[in-house]
Design a protein with these regions (language model features):
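C-terminal helix/juxtamembrane-tail motif
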Residues: 1, 103-105, 205, 562-578
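Low-complexity, Pro/Ser/Thr- and charge-rich linker/hinge segments at domain boundaries
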Residues: 160-174, 324-337, 560-569
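Acidic-aromatic/histidine active-site loop/patch
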Residues: 171-233, 237-242, 352, 370, ...
Length: 578
């Protein structure tokens, strides 16, 4: 019916105009929605030396944009960002986006001589970082030698439209980066010890947000301080960027609620401490509900290796209630497990389960068609160079293969069908079966080098069991897989039993993670679907073990369509020497 005063012809004209306006508004909203969904961001990273002083020691070290730790990248779930890395240092460098799966985009994954060759001094390269279902805290770091000791920073991935899960909404968040300080240049330490075949000394200090804290000399005036308001809830985004050490972390007199790990939600649980390995991230809620004052947050090293040196002086920071004026003579300190407490580590990790909620569904392979058992060991190699201190060199291996990097990237060789760079014969099982966690004194600790990779077909349902061994020096090894998050379906002490242990696998709510510690003289089992074509690195995130050869490579072949195949390489890829 027409509006009062309108003719029928005028009424029809008004309806047409209204319909056109509505169509325009809907189209505009769709464009805006598409733009929001496809949001893209650009960053510039300038890698250059800056002068820093810690422990009364001043040195020049590589950092990004003059910051240590480096800048935080803040984005939303599903977005893409580009980072143009300008290398103003004196040697080649690469950057890895730890925990970002990079669907079909191994070109921007970053590990040196695996997916790219280094960005040479005076040049630049732009990484395209493609997010998918990651949400929470991840991080970026250099991925060559030990350069990541000073070249690292956080990636904060906010939920779409900042719609936090009702259990996890904080007042605000704070990034807490655990790190390592070396008085000497860490890259030089790594290369000199590697050439000499020796085990490097421990770091000179542990760090929280770039500061050792007041348990170290010359450090009390620069301790990191986080100010809170009574009654408010805060999200601590904790990252272990340490080079070689797993860490305990806690806050005095405050309970921590774990809500996320490695860019995925977990079923919330409360604890007085966390155990976090190099490479891992954890999202922790803390409520400021104690008597206003000063409270230590602190780390200490978890190191159950028989022979490895470590620095067990705690890094400290201060949790300070707003309005507190004077610093007391005594500040509460968190109670943390001792350095070799395997039981405490196992107790903590057993509490981590996935949170099944809207927008975060499970996709756990209930059956598998590719099974691998990979032993991880520390070993020896013959050392014959003039730099050798002993006739043997420290080494490490997976399935008794100590990985040998090549001067050309494996991705470049694979994509361009270059022969002679690697072989596709990495063993799916240990070449020799033995009592892996028992008395191995009759076995040789020596291993052999090789560039041997494992190939998978697109959409293979994969199960990998990492089996620790007692060869040379048993210990907890944090294994990281690039290109995937995996479900940790099982773990245990001793030798994995393929007949009985799968009966106890958690196929209901296992944690979805990208890095996890294989327990000392124990094993872990993980599952994932190989639906990300490319070349993907697997390695221990204790950097000296990775440098020694505790690493290998997965090649996931293309699917049958363009959308299930590796993307074309970007322009400007750093050139390799072969």
């Amino acid at each position: 019916q027409s509006t009062w005063g309108e003719t029928e012809e005028e009424h029809q004209r008004t309806r047409k105009i209204a319909a056109m306006r509505l169509t325009f508004v809907v189209a505009l909203l769709l464009v805006m929605l598409t733009a929001c969904q496809a949001a893209t961001f650009y960053y510039d990273f300038v890698v250059a030396e800056s002068s820093y002083t810690r422990l009364c020691n001043t040195k020049n070290m590589l950092v990004v944009n003059g910051q240590f730790p480096g800048p935080t990248i803040t984005v939303h779930k599903g977005e893409t960002f580009f980072v143009n890395v300008h290398n103003q240092g004196s040697y080649g460098i690469t950057i890895h986006w730890h925990g970002v799966k990079q669907p079909r985009n191994p070109w921007s994954d970053g590990p040196e001589n695996i997916t790219q060759c280094p960005i040479q001094p005076g040049t630049n390269f732009t990484y395209q970082v493609i997010l998918s279902n990651e949400e929470g805290t991840l991080w970026w770091h250099a991925h060559n030698d030990w350069t990541r000791a000073s070249v690292h920073g956080a990636i904060v991935i906010l939920p779409p439209n900042n719609t936090y899960h009702r259990l996890t909404r904080p007042t605000s968040y704070q990034t807490i980066i655990l790190g390592s300080w070396f008085n000497a240049d860490p890259r030089t330490i790594a290369l000199q010890n590697h050439a000499a075949g020796t085990d490097p000394d421990a770091n000179d200090a542990n760090l929280i947000n770039g500061q050792p804290g007041d348990k170290y000399d010359c450090s009390s005036d620069s301790i990191y301080t986080m100010t809170v308001q009574f009654g408010k809830r805060y999200l601590l985004r904790v990252i272990n960027a340490g080079v070689n050490d797993e860490q305990w972390f806690g806050v005095a007199n405050h309970s921590l609620t774990v809500i996320g790990q490695d860019g995925a939600y977990v079923k919330p649980f409360s604890t007085n401490y966390v155990m976090i390995t190099p490479g891992q991230t954890m999202d922790l809620l803390i409520t400021a509900n104690q008597t206003p004052g000063y409270y230590y947050m602190a780390t200490s090293v978890f190191s159950d290796f028989n022979l490895a040196p470590f620095n067990n002086i705690s890094a400290t920071a201060i949790l300070l209630y707003n309005g507190t004026v004077s610093r007391p003579t005594s500040i509460p300190f968190p109670s943390l497990p001792n350095a070799t407490d395997d039981a405490a580590a196992a107790s903590f990790t057993s509490l981590i389960k996935s949170l099944d909620s809207y927008g975060h569904p499970f996709d756990i392979p209930q059956t598998v068609n590719q099974e691998m058992v990979i032993t991880i060991s520390t070993n020896f190699l013959n050392c014959t160079s003039p730099a050798c201190i002993n006739p043997f060199a420290f080494a490490a291996s997976t399935n008794n293969v100590s990985f040998l990097a090549q001067p050309i990237s494996i991705l470049q060789a694979y994509y361009n069908n270059v022969s002679g760079v690697y072989t596709e014969d990495f063993p799916s099982n240990p070449p020799e079966s033995f009592d892996y966690t028992g008395d191995v004194s009759a076995l040789t600790p020596y291993t052999a080098q090789g560039t041997r990779v494992k190939t998978l077909n697109y959409n293979d349902r994969v199960q990998i069991v990492f089996q620790g061994t007692n060869i040379l020096s048993a210990g907890n090894h944090p294994m990281h897989i690039h290109g995937f998050s995996f479900y940790l379906v099982g773990k245990g002490a001793g030798n994995y039993n393929s007949a009985t242990d799968p009966q106890n696998f958690n196929l209901a709510n296992p944690p979805l993670i990208n890095t996890f510690g294989v327990p000392k003289n124990g094993w872990i089992a993980l599952r994932f679907v190989a639906n990300n074509p490319g070349v993907w690195f697997i390695h221990c995130h204790i950097d000296k073990h990775a440098l020694w050869g505790m690493q290998t490579v997965l090649i996931v072949k293309n699917g049958n369509t363009a959308l299930t195949s590796i993307r074309a390489p970007p322009t400007g890829m750093p050139q390799c020497s072969a």
